[in-house]
Design a protein with these regions (language model features):
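A composition-biased, non-transmembrane "mature-region" signal
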Residues: 1-170
């Protein structure tokens, strides 16, 4: 592993590990799905990638005094399998949307990210739920390593190289 591998997020398989077929690699990545995992890995259906791992971190709505508000936050890892190079190119994407509608205001905030990201975050909020009961409306804990490390391990264990993409084509 070279210096630039560390900086770029490239993970190479151990020497002597033979690369499996793309079908076997895809099956190994999809096998990471489990009921207890906070994320889901699926085949990409829009053609922008081969596989996508998505963690829906927060999706909450609540009532405030004279208004309603909400927060939605998600993190995705899109992956493209390059059979010729036995390489998986991956890009991290996240988005956050928060909104508030009340008297006399209407407010919307949205942000997004594309590249390579390492994040640890957490949050909680108490308010009136949509059932008009006071309590916790969201509580989340997020660590991007929990989704990326198993993916990288599955790729390198099967003889392929993991390459993080920040600016280039996936």
């Amino acid at each position: 592993m070279g210096l630039f591998d560390f900086l770029s997020g490239r993970k190479r398989p151990k020497s002597g590990v033979v690369a499996v077929s793309s079908d076997k690699l895809e099956a190994a990545i999809l096998a990471l799905n489990r009921d207890t995992a906070p994320y889901q890995i699926t085949k990409c259906d829009d053609g922008s990638c081969d596989l996508v791992a998505e963690w829906k971190i927060v999706d909450a709505k609540w009532y405030e005094i004279f208004g309603k508000a909400g927060l939605k936050k998600a993190f995705k890892v899109k992956m493209r399998l390059d059979v010729e190079k036995s390489e998986v190119r991956a890009v991290d994407m996240d988005y956050t949307v928060s909104w508030r509608a009340g008297v006399p205001e209407l407010e919307l905030h949205a942000s997004g990210f594309r590249g390579q990201k390492s994040e640890i975050s957490f949050g909680t909020a108490y308010a009136f739920s949509e059932e008009l009961e006071f309590g916790q409306v969201y509580n989340y804990r997020f660590n991007s390593a929990e989704i990326k490390k198993p993916l990288q391990q599955a790729v390198t264990d099967n003889g392929w190289t993991w390459r993080g993409v920040a600016f280039g084509k996936l």
